[in-house]
Amino acid sequence: MGVETSSAWQALQLHSDSGMGSIHLSKLFQDTNRQDDYSLELSDVYVDFSKNRITQETVQLLIELAEQQKLPKEIHRLMTGEHVNDTEDRPALHTALRALGKDVSGGAETVQPEIEQVLQKMELMTKKIRSGHWRGYSGKPITDVVNIGVGGSDLGPLMITHSLQTISSPINLHFISSIDGTQTSNLLRGLKQETTLFILASKSFTTIDTLSNAETAKDWLKECISDERVIFSQHFIGVSTKPDKMQEWGIPPENQLMFWDWVGGRYSLWSAIGFPIALKIGMDGFRELLQGAHEMDQHFATADLKKNIPVILALIDIWNINFLNIHDKAILPYDARLRYLPAYLEQLVMESNGKSVARSGESVPYKTCPVLWGEVGPNAQHAFYQLLHQGTQAVMCDFIAPVERDDFDANSHTERDESLRHQHELALANCFAQSRVLMLGDNAIPSDLKASFDSPFKHYPGNQPSNTILIKTISAKTLGMLVAMYEHKTYVESVIWEINPFDQWGVELGKLIAKETYNAIKDKPLADSFDSSTKGLIDRVVK
Protein backbone atom coordinates (compact mmCIF):
# COMPACT_ATOMS: atom_id res chain seq x y z
CA MET A 1 0.00 0.00 0.00
CA GLY A 2 1.31 3.45 -0.90
CA VAL A 3 1.48 6.73 0.97
CA GLU A 4 -1.95 7.74 -0.38
CA THR A 5 -3.66 5.18 1.87
CA SER A 6 -1.79 6.25 5.01
CA SER A 7 -3.40 7.98 7.96
CA ALA A 8 -1.32 11.15 7.53
CA TRP A 9 -2.27 11.47 3.85
CA GLN A 10 -5.93 10.84 4.59
CA ALA A 11 -5.87 13.46 7.34
CA LEU A 12 -4.56 16.03 4.86
CA GLN A 13 -7.24 15.05 2.36
CA LEU A 14 -9.92 15.53 4.99
CA HIS A 15 -8.36 18.88 5.94
CA SER A 16 -8.53 20.01 2.31
CA ASP A 17 -12.09 18.76 1.82
CA SER A 18 -13.29 20.47 4.98
CA GLY A 19 -12.68 23.96 3.60
CA MET A 20 -8.95 24.59 3.25
CA GLY A 21 -9.10 23.57 -0.40
CA SER A 22 -11.41 26.45 -1.24
CA ILE A 23 -10.47 29.15 1.27
CA HIS A 24 -9.30 32.45 -0.24
CA LEU A 25 -5.92 33.85 0.71
CA SER A 26 -7.47 37.25 1.36
CA LYS A 27 -9.31 35.71 4.31
CA LEU A 28 -6.13 34.20 5.73
CA PHE A 29 -4.43 37.59 5.55
CA GLN A 30 -6.93 39.06 7.95
CA ASP A 31 -4.37 37.83 10.48
CA THR A 32 -1.97 40.77 10.65
CA ASN A 33 0.85 38.58 12.02
CA ARG A 34 0.64 36.06 9.20
CA GLN A 35 3.84 37.05 7.45
CA ASP A 36 5.88 36.70 10.65
CA ASP A 37 4.38 33.28 11.35
CA TYR A 38 5.02 31.92 7.86
CA SER A 39 8.57 32.95 7.04
CA LEU A 40 12.03 31.52 7.70
CA GLU A 41 15.55 32.90 7.43
CA LEU A 42 19.02 31.43 7.17
CA SER A 43 21.98 33.77 6.87
CA ASP A 44 21.51 35.68 3.58
CA VAL A 45 18.37 33.80 2.48
CA TYR A 46 14.87 34.83 3.57
CA VAL A 47 11.76 32.84 2.60
CA ASP A 48 8.22 34.20 2.89
CA PHE A 49 5.73 31.36 2.35
CA SER A 50 2.75 33.19 3.83
CA LYS A 51 1.00 33.51 0.45
CA ASN A 52 0.00 29.84 0.46
CA ARG A 53 -3.37 28.41 1.42
CA ILE A 54 -2.11 26.98 4.69
CA THR A 55 -2.75 27.37 8.40
CA GLN A 56 -0.81 26.13 11.40
CA GLU A 57 -3.00 23.03 11.28
CA THR A 58 -1.97 22.45 7.66
CA VAL A 59 1.69 22.76 8.55
CA GLN A 60 1.31 20.36 11.48
CA LEU A 61 -0.45 17.78 9.31
CA LEU A 62 2.29 18.08 6.69
CA ILE A 63 4.96 17.60 9.36
CA GLU A 64 3.13 14.47 10.51
CA LEU A 65 3.19 13.21 6.91
CA ALA A 66 6.95 13.84 6.76
CA GLU A 67 7.50 12.01 10.04
CA GLN A 68 5.35 9.11 8.87
CA GLN A 69 7.56 8.86 5.75
CA LYS A 70 10.62 8.79 8.04
CA LEU A 71 12.01 11.99 6.54
CA PRO A 72 14.63 12.63 9.29
CA LYS A 73 16.03 9.14 8.70
CA GLU A 74 16.07 9.66 4.92
CA ILE A 75 17.88 12.98 5.32
CA HIS A 76 20.50 11.22 7.43
CA ARG A 77 20.85 8.47 4.83
CA LEU A 78 21.44 11.05 2.09
CA MET A 79 23.97 13.06 4.07
CA THR A 80 26.03 10.07 5.24
CA GLY A 81 26.34 8.42 1.85
CA GLU A 82 23.94 5.51 2.10
CA HIS A 83 22.66 4.11 -1.19
CA VAL A 84 19.61 6.34 -1.63
CA ASN A 85 19.80 5.79 -5.40
CA ASP A 86 18.44 2.28 -5.12
CA THR A 87 17.74 1.56 -8.80
CA GLU A 88 21.44 2.10 -9.57
CA ASP A 89 22.66 0.94 -6.13
CA ARG A 90 24.63 4.12 -5.45
CA PRO A 91 24.85 6.91 -2.92
CA ALA A 92 24.10 10.48 -3.98
CA LEU A 93 27.05 12.29 -2.48
CA HIS A 94 26.77 15.75 -4.01
CA THR A 95 26.64 17.18 -0.48
CA ALA A 96 30.08 15.65 0.19
CA LEU A 97 31.51 17.71 -2.67
CA ARG A 98 30.89 20.94 -0.77
CA ALA A 99 31.69 19.74 2.76
CA LEU A 100 35.31 20.92 2.36
CA GLY A 101 36.42 18.19 4.76
CA LYS A 102 34.20 19.11 7.70
CA ASP A 103 30.87 18.19 9.29
CA VAL A 104 30.62 14.85 7.48
CA SER A 105 30.47 11.19 8.43
CA GLY A 106 30.03 7.78 6.87
CA GLY A 107 30.55 7.51 3.12
CA ALA A 108 30.62 11.30 2.81
CA GLU A 109 33.72 11.39 5.01
CA THR A 110 35.42 8.54 3.15
CA VAL A 111 35.47 10.39 -0.18
CA GLN A 112 36.87 13.68 1.17
CA PRO A 113 40.52 12.97 0.23
CA GLU A 114 39.55 12.25 -3.40
CA ILE A 115 37.47 15.41 -3.55
CA GLU A 116 40.27 17.57 -2.17
CA GLN A 117 42.75 16.06 -4.62
CA VAL A 118 40.55 17.09 -7.57
CA LEU A 119 40.00 20.56 -6.09
CA GLN A 120 43.77 21.02 -5.85
CA LYS A 121 44.23 20.01 -9.49
CA MET A 122 41.40 22.37 -10.47
CA GLU A 123 43.16 25.16 -8.60
CA LEU A 124 46.46 24.59 -10.40
CA MET A 125 44.78 24.52 -13.80
CA THR A 126 42.61 27.54 -12.98
CA LYS A 127 45.60 29.63 -11.91
CA LYS A 128 47.56 28.60 -15.00
CA ILE A 129 44.77 29.64 -17.37
CA ARG A 130 43.71 32.83 -15.55
CA SER A 131 47.32 34.01 -15.21
CA GLY A 132 48.00 33.61 -18.93
CA HIS A 133 50.51 30.78 -18.50
CA TRP A 134 48.40 28.23 -20.38
CA ARG A 135 49.26 28.93 -23.98
CA GLY A 136 47.93 27.80 -27.32
CA TYR A 137 49.89 26.32 -30.22
CA SER A 138 51.36 29.70 -31.26
CA GLY A 139 52.57 30.59 -27.78
CA LYS A 140 49.87 33.18 -27.13
CA PRO A 141 47.92 32.98 -23.83
CA ILE A 142 44.45 31.45 -23.86
CA THR A 143 41.80 34.18 -23.90
CA ASP A 144 38.63 32.18 -24.64
CA VAL A 145 37.41 28.97 -23.02
CA VAL A 146 34.50 27.03 -24.53
CA ASN A 147 32.62 24.54 -22.36
CA ILE A 148 31.15 21.72 -24.46
CA GLY A 149 28.53 19.77 -22.51
CA VAL A 150 24.82 19.20 -22.23
CA GLY A 151 22.33 18.86 -19.39
CA GLY A 152 24.10 18.85 -16.04
CA SER A 153 27.46 19.39 -17.76
CA ASP A 154 26.18 22.67 -19.18
CA LEU A 155 23.24 24.16 -17.26
CA GLY A 156 24.89 24.45 -13.85
CA PRO A 157 28.10 26.21 -14.94
CA LEU A 158 26.13 28.33 -17.43
CA MET A 159 23.62 29.44 -14.81
CA ILE A 160 26.21 30.25 -12.13
CA THR A 161 28.64 32.10 -14.41
CA HIS A 162 25.84 34.14 -15.97
CA SER A 163 24.53 35.00 -12.51
CA LEU A 164 28.00 36.20 -11.49
CA GLN A 165 28.61 38.11 -14.71
CA THR A 166 29.52 41.34 -12.89
CA ILE A 167 32.67 39.68 -11.50
CA SER A 168 35.56 40.55 -13.79
CA SER A 169 37.57 37.70 -15.28
CA PRO A 170 40.64 37.50 -17.54
CA ILE A 171 38.93 34.71 -19.50
CA ASN A 172 36.00 34.94 -21.91
CA LEU A 173 33.69 31.98 -21.25
CA HIS A 174 31.40 30.41 -23.84
CA PHE A 175 29.03 27.45 -23.74
CA ILE A 176 28.00 24.97 -26.43
CA SER A 177 25.30 22.37 -25.79
CA SER A 178 22.97 21.93 -28.77
CA ILE A 179 23.50 18.89 -30.99
CA ASP A 180 22.41 20.67 -34.19
CA GLY A 181 25.73 22.52 -34.61
CA THR A 182 24.29 26.03 -34.88
CA GLN A 183 25.79 27.21 -31.58
CA THR A 184 29.15 25.74 -32.53
CA SER A 185 29.23 27.25 -36.01
CA ASN A 186 28.18 30.70 -34.85
CA LEU A 187 30.64 30.76 -31.94
CA LEU A 188 33.71 29.51 -33.79
CA ARG A 189 33.36 32.23 -36.42
CA GLY A 190 34.26 34.79 -33.75
CA LEU A 191 37.16 32.92 -32.10
CA LYS A 192 40.82 32.31 -32.93
CA GLN A 193 42.32 28.83 -32.79
CA GLU A 194 45.57 30.01 -31.22
CA THR A 195 43.87 31.47 -28.13
CA THR A 196 40.92 29.10 -27.63
CA LEU A 197 40.70 26.22 -25.16
CA PHE A 198 37.86 23.70 -25.05
CA ILE A 199 36.51 21.95 -21.96
CA LEU A 200 34.89 18.66 -22.97
CA ALA A 201 32.52 17.81 -20.11
CA SER A 202 30.62 14.53 -20.09
CA LYS A 203 29.98 12.15 -17.21
CA SER A 204 30.01 9.05 -19.43
CA PHE A 205 32.12 10.52 -22.22
CA THR A 206 29.72 8.86 -24.65
CA THR A 207 27.08 11.62 -24.94
CA ILE A 208 26.55 12.07 -28.68
CA ASP A 209 25.52 15.73 -28.31
CA THR A 210 28.81 16.58 -26.64
CA LEU A 211 31.10 14.38 -28.73
CA SER A 212 29.66 15.62 -32.03
CA ASN A 213 30.34 19.23 -31.00
CA ALA A 214 33.81 18.23 -29.80
CA GLU A 215 34.62 16.63 -33.16
CA THR A 216 33.56 19.84 -34.92
CA ALA A 217 35.79 21.85 -32.56
CA LYS A 218 38.70 19.48 -33.22
CA ASP A 219 38.23 19.81 -36.99
CA TRP A 220 38.24 23.60 -36.58
CA LEU A 221 41.54 23.43 -34.69
CA LYS A 222 43.01 21.18 -37.40
CA GLU A 223 42.61 24.03 -39.87
CA CYS A 224 45.61 25.65 -38.13
CA ILE A 225 47.29 22.83 -36.20
CA SER A 226 48.72 19.81 -38.02
CA ASP A 227 49.97 17.96 -34.93
CA GLU A 228 47.08 16.30 -33.05
CA ARG A 229 49.22 15.97 -29.93
CA VAL A 230 49.37 19.77 -29.75
CA ILE A 231 45.60 20.00 -30.22
CA PHE A 232 44.92 17.72 -27.27
CA SER A 233 47.70 18.91 -24.96
CA GLN A 234 47.16 22.66 -25.42
CA HIS A 235 43.57 23.09 -26.56
CA PHE A 236 41.45 20.47 -24.77
CA ILE A 237 40.63 19.68 -21.14
CA GLY A 238 38.38 16.75 -20.30
CA VAL A 239 36.00 16.41 -17.35
CA SER A 240 34.47 12.98 -16.83
CA THR A 241 34.12 9.91 -14.64
CA LYS A 242 35.82 7.88 -17.40
CA PRO A 243 39.57 8.56 -17.67
CA ASP A 244 40.05 5.69 -20.12
CA LYS A 245 37.50 7.13 -22.54
CA MET A 246 39.03 10.61 -22.26
CA GLN A 247 42.46 9.18 -23.10
CA GLU A 248 41.03 7.09 -25.93
CA TRP A 249 39.56 10.26 -27.44
CA GLY A 250 42.97 11.91 -27.15
CA ILE A 251 42.99 13.96 -23.93
CA PRO A 252 46.17 13.24 -21.91
CA PRO A 253 45.91 12.44 -18.16
CA GLU A 254 47.41 15.79 -17.14
CA ASN A 255 44.50 17.54 -18.89
CA GLN A 256 41.84 15.41 -17.24
CA LEU A 257 39.64 16.38 -14.29
CA MET A 258 37.76 13.58 -12.60
CA PHE A 259 34.49 13.17 -10.80
CA TRP A 260 32.58 10.07 -9.76
CA ASP A 261 29.56 7.88 -10.56
CA TRP A 262 27.96 8.90 -7.26
CA VAL A 263 27.59 12.46 -8.56
CA GLY A 264 24.39 12.83 -10.57
CA GLY A 265 24.69 15.02 -13.65
CA ARG A 266 22.12 17.54 -12.45
CA TYR A 267 23.90 17.71 -9.08
CA SER A 268 27.40 18.03 -10.55
CA LEU A 269 28.18 21.76 -10.65
CA TRP A 270 29.90 21.30 -7.26
CA SER A 271 32.38 18.85 -8.84
CA ALA A 272 34.98 19.33 -11.57
CA ILE A 273 32.02 20.01 -13.87
CA GLY A 274 32.11 23.41 -12.16
CA PHE A 275 35.57 24.11 -13.62
CA PRO A 276 34.18 26.94 -15.83
CA ILE A 277 32.83 28.56 -12.67
CA ALA A 278 36.31 28.50 -11.15
CA LEU A 279 37.71 30.02 -14.34
CA LYS A 280 35.16 32.82 -14.08
CA ILE A 281 35.43 33.68 -10.37
CA GLY A 282 38.66 31.98 -9.27
CA MET A 283 39.04 29.07 -6.88
CA ASP A 284 38.41 31.25 -3.84
CA GLY A 285 35.06 32.16 -5.35
CA PHE A 286 34.34 28.53 -6.20
CA ARG A 287 35.02 27.51 -2.62
CA GLU A 288 32.69 30.30 -1.48
CA LEU A 289 30.00 28.73 -3.68
CA LEU A 290 30.65 25.37 -2.01
CA GLN A 291 30.58 26.98 1.43
CA GLY A 292 27.19 28.56 0.76
CA ALA A 293 25.78 25.20 -0.29
CA HIS A 294 27.35 23.53 2.75
CA GLU A 295 25.68 26.04 5.05
CA MET A 296 22.31 25.05 3.58
CA ASP A 297 23.30 21.37 3.89
CA GLN A 298 23.95 21.78 7.60
CA HIS A 299 20.66 23.59 8.09
CA PHE A 300 18.84 20.83 6.20
CA ALA A 301 20.54 18.11 8.24
CA THR A 302 20.04 19.65 11.68
CA ALA A 303 17.08 22.06 11.75
CA ASP A 304 13.76 21.04 13.23
CA LEU A 305 11.35 20.07 10.45
CA LYS A 306 9.07 23.05 11.18
CA LYS A 307 12.01 25.47 10.89
CA ASN A 308 13.72 23.70 8.00
CA ILE A 309 13.53 25.79 4.82
CA PRO A 310 13.85 23.02 2.18
CA VAL A 311 11.47 20.79 4.15
CA ILE A 312 8.77 23.44 4.52
CA LEU A 313 8.99 24.49 0.87
CA ALA A 314 8.72 20.86 -0.23
CA LEU A 315 5.76 20.10 2.02
CA ILE A 316 3.91 23.18 0.79
CA ASP A 317 4.37 21.99 -2.79
CA ILE A 318 3.10 18.54 -1.77
CA TRP A 319 0.02 20.26 -0.31
CA ASN A 320 -0.52 22.32 -3.45
CA ILE A 321 -0.01 19.42 -5.85
CA ASN A 322 -1.70 16.52 -4.10
CA PHE A 323 -4.44 18.23 -2.11
CA LEU A 324 -5.18 21.47 -4.00
CA ASN A 325 -4.65 19.98 -7.49
CA ILE A 326 -2.13 22.57 -8.66
CA HIS A 327 0.23 20.98 -11.17
CA ASP A 328 2.21 23.90 -12.62
CA LYS A 329 5.03 25.86 -11.04
CA ALA A 330 6.62 29.08 -12.30
CA ILE A 331 10.11 30.25 -11.29
CA LEU A 332 10.24 34.04 -11.52
CA PRO A 333 13.59 35.70 -10.75
CA TYR A 334 13.53 39.50 -10.61
CA ASP A 335 17.08 40.04 -11.78
CA ALA A 336 18.25 39.33 -15.33
CA ARG A 337 21.46 37.80 -14.00
CA LEU A 338 19.31 34.85 -12.87
CA ARG A 339 18.07 34.33 -16.42
CA TYR A 340 19.13 30.68 -16.57
CA LEU A 341 17.85 29.71 -13.12
CA PRO A 342 14.42 28.56 -14.40
CA ALA A 343 16.04 26.28 -17.00
CA TYR A 344 18.45 24.92 -14.39
CA LEU A 345 15.60 24.14 -12.00
CA GLU A 346 13.56 22.58 -14.81
CA GLN A 347 16.22 19.91 -15.12
CA LEU A 348 16.83 19.55 -11.39
CA VAL A 349 13.15 19.14 -10.52
CA MET A 350 11.61 17.42 -13.53
CA GLU A 351 14.46 15.00 -14.26
CA SER A 352 14.58 14.10 -10.57
CA ASN A 353 10.90 13.77 -9.73
CA GLY A 354 9.21 13.36 -13.10
CA LYS A 355 8.51 9.74 -12.21
CA SER A 356 5.37 7.59 -12.12
CA VAL A 357 6.85 4.47 -10.53
CA ALA A 358 7.57 4.17 -6.81
CA ARG A 359 10.74 2.67 -5.36
CA SER A 360 8.71 -0.52 -4.90
CA GLY A 361 8.27 -0.83 -8.67
CA GLU A 362 4.55 -0.10 -8.50
CA SER A 363 2.86 2.71 -10.43
CA VAL A 364 1.90 5.61 -8.20
CA PRO A 365 -1.80 6.58 -8.18
CA TYR A 366 -1.13 10.22 -7.24
CA LYS A 367 0.48 13.19 -8.97
CA THR A 368 4.19 13.73 -8.51
CA CYS A 369 6.34 16.42 -10.14
CA PRO A 370 4.64 19.55 -11.46
CA VAL A 371 5.42 21.03 -14.85
CA LEU A 372 8.04 23.63 -13.98
CA TRP A 373 8.83 26.64 -16.15
CA GLY A 374 9.71 30.28 -15.80
CA GLU A 375 11.38 33.44 -17.02
CA VAL A 376 12.95 36.61 -15.69
CA GLY A 377 9.98 38.21 -13.91
CA PRO A 378 9.87 41.67 -15.53
CA ASN A 379 9.95 40.04 -18.99
CA ALA A 380 7.40 37.41 -17.99
CA GLN A 381 5.00 40.16 -16.92
CA HIS A 382 4.73 41.06 -20.60
CA ALA A 383 4.36 37.43 -21.69
CA PHE A 384 2.53 34.87 -19.56
CA TYR A 385 1.40 36.78 -16.46
CA GLN A 386 -1.94 37.23 -18.22
CA LEU A 387 -2.44 33.49 -17.71
CA LEU A 388 -1.32 33.68 -14.09
CA HIS A 389 -3.80 36.43 -13.28
CA GLN A 390 -6.83 35.54 -15.40
CA GLY A 391 -6.27 32.11 -16.92
CA THR A 392 -7.94 28.83 -16.02
CA GLN A 393 -4.73 27.21 -14.75
CA ALA A 394 -3.81 27.23 -11.08
CA VAL A 395 -0.07 27.91 -10.85
CA MET A 396 2.33 27.98 -7.91
CA CYS A 397 5.01 30.65 -8.18
CA ASP A 398 8.41 31.24 -6.64
CA PHE A 399 9.42 34.92 -6.78
CA ILE A 400 13.18 35.33 -6.30
CA ALA A 401 15.02 38.63 -5.89
CA PRO A 402 18.21 40.11 -4.44
CA VAL A 403 17.64 42.76 -1.77
CA GLU A 404 20.80 44.61 -2.78
CA ARG A 405 22.76 45.04 -5.98
CA ASP A 406 26.53 44.86 -6.02
CA ASP A 407 27.21 46.16 -9.53
CA PHE A 408 27.15 49.84 -8.58
CA ASP A 409 28.27 51.99 -5.66
CA ALA A 410 25.35 52.15 -3.21
CA ASN A 411 26.79 55.29 -1.63
CA SER A 412 27.37 57.08 -4.90
CA HIS A 413 25.01 59.77 -6.15
CA THR A 414 26.14 59.90 -9.77
CA GLU A 415 23.33 59.97 -12.30
CA ARG A 416 24.21 56.48 -13.49
CA ASP A 417 24.17 54.96 -10.02
CA GLU A 418 20.96 56.78 -9.12
CA SER A 419 19.37 55.35 -12.28
CA LEU A 420 20.52 51.83 -11.43
CA ARG A 421 19.23 52.20 -7.88
CA HIS A 422 15.90 53.38 -9.27
CA GLN A 423 15.71 50.38 -11.63
CA HIS A 424 16.48 47.95 -8.83
CA GLU A 425 13.75 49.46 -6.66
CA LEU A 426 11.33 49.24 -9.60
CA ALA A 427 12.14 45.54 -10.02
CA LEU A 428 11.52 44.86 -6.33
CA ALA A 429 8.28 46.85 -6.40
CA ASN A 430 7.04 44.80 -9.35
CA CYS A 431 8.06 41.55 -7.67
CA PHE A 432 6.16 42.33 -4.48
CA ALA A 433 3.17 43.82 -6.33
CA GLN A 434 2.72 40.83 -8.63
CA SER A 435 2.75 38.33 -5.76
CA ARG A 436 0.26 40.56 -3.91
CA VAL A 437 -2.17 40.70 -6.85
CA LEU A 438 -1.84 36.95 -7.48
CA MET A 439 -2.77 36.43 -3.84
CA LEU A 440 -5.53 39.01 -3.30
CA GLY A 441 -6.95 39.47 -6.77
CA ASP A 442 -9.66 42.16 -6.82
CA ASN A 443 -9.04 42.79 -3.13
CA ALA A 444 -5.75 44.45 -4.09
CA ILE A 445 -7.51 47.17 -6.11
CA PRO A 446 -7.35 50.55 -4.31
CA SER A 447 -10.81 51.76 -3.31
CA ASP A 448 -10.56 54.90 -5.44
CA LEU A 449 -9.95 52.76 -8.56
CA LYS A 450 -12.58 50.06 -8.06
CA ALA A 451 -15.08 51.75 -10.38
CA SER A 452 -12.62 51.60 -13.28
CA PHE A 453 -12.26 47.83 -12.77
CA ASP A 454 -16.03 47.21 -12.76
CA SER A 455 -15.99 44.83 -15.73
CA PRO A 456 -15.88 41.01 -16.02
CA PHE A 457 -12.84 41.43 -18.28
CA LYS A 458 -10.97 43.23 -15.50
CA HIS A 459 -11.75 40.67 -12.80
CA TYR A 460 -8.78 39.25 -10.89
CA PRO A 461 -9.71 36.08 -8.98
CA GLY A 462 -6.42 35.91 -7.06
CA ASN A 463 -5.81 32.97 -4.72
CA GLN A 464 -2.72 31.85 -6.66
CA PRO A 465 -0.16 30.59 -4.11
CA SER A 466 3.42 31.80 -4.12
CA ASN A 467 6.66 31.97 -2.17
CA THR A 468 8.96 34.99 -2.15
CA ILE A 469 12.64 34.17 -1.72
CA LEU A 470 14.96 37.08 -1.00
CA ILE A 471 18.73 36.78 -1.08
CA LYS A 472 20.94 39.55 0.26
CA THR A 473 22.73 39.94 -3.06
CA ILE A 474 23.72 37.72 -5.96
CA SER A 475 27.02 36.22 -4.82
CA ALA A 476 28.75 32.86 -4.96
CA LYS A 477 27.64 32.18 -1.39
CA THR A 478 23.96 33.02 -1.88
CA LEU A 479 23.81 31.08 -5.15
CA GLY A 480 25.28 28.08 -3.37
CA MET A 481 22.63 28.36 -0.67
CA LEU A 482 19.82 28.86 -3.19
CA VAL A 483 20.71 25.89 -5.39
CA ALA A 484 21.27 23.58 -2.40
CA MET A 485 17.90 24.68 -1.02
CA TYR A 486 16.16 23.57 -4.22
CA GLU A 487 18.16 20.32 -4.32
CA HIS A 488 17.04 19.39 -0.82
CA LYS A 489 13.48 20.50 -1.47
CA THR A 490 13.41 18.14 -4.46
CA TYR A 491 14.74 15.28 -2.33
CA VAL A 492 12.12 15.83 0.38
CA GLU A 493 9.34 15.64 -2.21
CA SER A 494 10.77 12.36 -3.51
CA VAL A 495 10.72 10.90 0.00
CA ILE A 496 7.06 11.81 0.45
CA TRP A 497 6.15 10.43 -3.00
CA GLU A 498 8.31 7.31 -2.46
CA ILE A 499 10.19 7.75 -5.74
CA ASN A 500 13.90 7.77 -6.61
CA PRO A 501 15.06 11.29 -7.58
CA PHE A 502 18.56 10.19 -8.60
CA ASP A 503 17.93 8.11 -11.73
CA GLN A 504 16.59 9.20 -15.12
CA TRP A 505 15.61 6.09 -17.05
CA GLY A 506 13.03 8.11 -18.95
CA VAL A 507 15.69 9.74 -21.13
CA GLU A 508 17.38 6.52 -22.28
CA LEU A 509 14.96 5.09 -24.85
CA GLY A 510 14.81 8.29 -26.89
CA LYS A 511 18.60 8.29 -27.22
CA LEU A 512 18.57 4.64 -28.31
CA ILE A 513 15.88 5.17 -30.94
CA ALA A 514 17.70 8.29 -32.18
CA LYS A 515 20.70 6.11 -33.16
CA GLU A 516 18.44 3.83 -35.18
CA THR A 517 16.78 6.84 -36.80
CA TYR A 518 20.15 8.41 -37.60
CA ASN A 519 21.17 5.27 -39.48
CA ALA A 520 17.98 5.52 -41.53
CA ILE A 521 18.65 9.19 -42.34
CA LYS A 522 22.13 8.19 -43.52
CA ASP A 523 20.37 6.29 -46.34
CA LYS A 524 20.38 2.85 -44.80
CA PRO A 525 17.28 0.63 -45.06
CA LEU A 526 14.38 1.78 -42.90
CA ALA A 527 13.65 -0.45 -39.93
CA ASP A 528 10.38 -2.34 -40.16
CA SER A 529 9.52 -1.04 -36.71
CA PHE A 530 9.23 2.56 -37.92
CA ASP A 531 5.74 3.98 -37.92
CA SER A 532 4.31 5.71 -40.98
CA SER A 533 4.84 9.19 -39.54
CA THR A 534 8.54 8.64 -38.83
CA LYS A 535 9.04 6.98 -42.22
CA GLY A 536 7.38 9.92 -43.92
CA LEU A 537 9.50 12.46 -42.06
CA ILE A 538 12.71 10.59 -42.92
CA ASP A 539 11.66 10.42 -46.57
CA ARG A 540 11.29 14.20 -46.67
CA VAL A 541 14.82 14.63 -45.28
CA VAL A 542 16.71 12.09 -47.41
CA LYS A 543 15.14 12.95 -50.79
Curated annotation (Swiss-Prot):
One of its GO terms (biological process) is glycolytic process. GO terms for molecular function: carbohydrate derivative binding; glucose-6-phosphate isomerase activity; monosaccharide binding. GO terms for cellular component: cytosol. Its main location: cytoplasm. The active site is at residues 351, 382, 511. It catalyses: alpha-D-glucose 6-phosphate = beta-D-fructose 6-phosphate. Pfam families: PGI (PF00342). Its EC number is 5.3.1.9. InterPro entries: G6P_Isomerase, G6P_Isomerase_C, Phosphoglucose_isomerase_CS, SIS_dom_sf, SIS_PGI_1, SIS_PGI_2. Keywords: Cytoplasm, Gluconeogenesis, Glycolysis, Isomerase. It is found in: Cytoplasm. The keyword Transcription regulation does not apply. The keyword Isomerase applies. Pathway: Carbohydrate biosynthesis; gluconeogenesis; Carbohydrate degradation; glycolysis; D-glyceraldehyde 3-phosphate and glycerone phosphate from D-glucose: step 2/4. Catalyzes the reversible isomerization of glucose-6-phosphate to fructose-6-phosphate. Belongs to the GPI family. NCBIfam families: PRK00179.1 (NF001211). This is Glucose-6-phosphate isomerase. It comes from Hydrogenovibrio crunogenus (strain DSM 25203 / XCL-2) (Thiomicrospira crunogena).
